[in-house]
Amino acid sequence: MQTLDKHKTVTVSQLADNLHVSESTIRRDLIALDRMGKLCKVHGGATINNSNSYLTLEEDVLTKQDLHNREKTLIAKYAAALIGPEDFVYLDAGTTTYHMLDYLGHTAASVTYVTNGIQHAARLAAMGCKVYLPGGRLKANTQAVIGTEAIRSISNYNFTKGFFGANGISTTAGFSTPDFSESNVKTEALHHCQKRFILADSSKFKKVFPVTFASIQEADIITDMLPDDKYSKLTNVYEAGERK
């Protein structure tokens, strides 16, 4: 990606020579990166992807659990380390925030949590943590509590830190998600957090979904690797992965 960022276009043979791998390996990698929206595969090579991908469909939680696990683990571990004793934390429903529960450590018992994630609440309770679950309607495919009752409950809280997922991140559309009701809950919770963090792997960048729940400037981003430096000019970005 660094070669492509520098030259804007690159051939399969150039990449094979530079990376000392076969052209068939390069072609497979380019196909995968094209599907992730990180570049545009063309005949004989690839070009940089400067445009946003506009998407509407949302995968269910079981499908998401199997995607980008390495990246989610890096992000979750970094995010969990930001939680300190006596924090009052909001955890948004989502697979990356769920990964955080593996790394809460010895401070978990002294922290109070509010989450709209059913799986999150059950796991935190099993760990002996103090956890509150807002009322509302259960969205089956994401296991998230949504609706006006959830928003009303969350509006009473003042969180020290909040950790949120996002389906898409764009410099123009901000942080976005496919569902209006889920977006409203995210927005309400985010506005009641002193510190706000969006947890998103690098595949989420340059993607736009129907509903924006916050602008780029409203939250810091924790990702595995930043695909474009322009985001760091708009907000704080923390990279949990290693640059290659």
Show where each model-derived region lies.
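HTH-adjacent hinge/linker in prokaryotic transcriptional regulators
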Residues: 2-13, 18, 24, 28-90, ...
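Short, glycine-rich nucleotide/cofactor-binding loops
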Residues: 68, 91, 172-176
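Gly/Ser/Thr-rich loops at beta-strand to alpha-helix junctions
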Residues: 95-98
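A residue-level structural signature of the nucleotidyltransferase/glycosyltransferase Rossmann-like core
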Residues: 112-113, 161
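Conserved phosphate- and dinucleotide-binding cores of soluble alpha/beta proteins
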Residues: 2, 9-15, 20-22, 41, ...
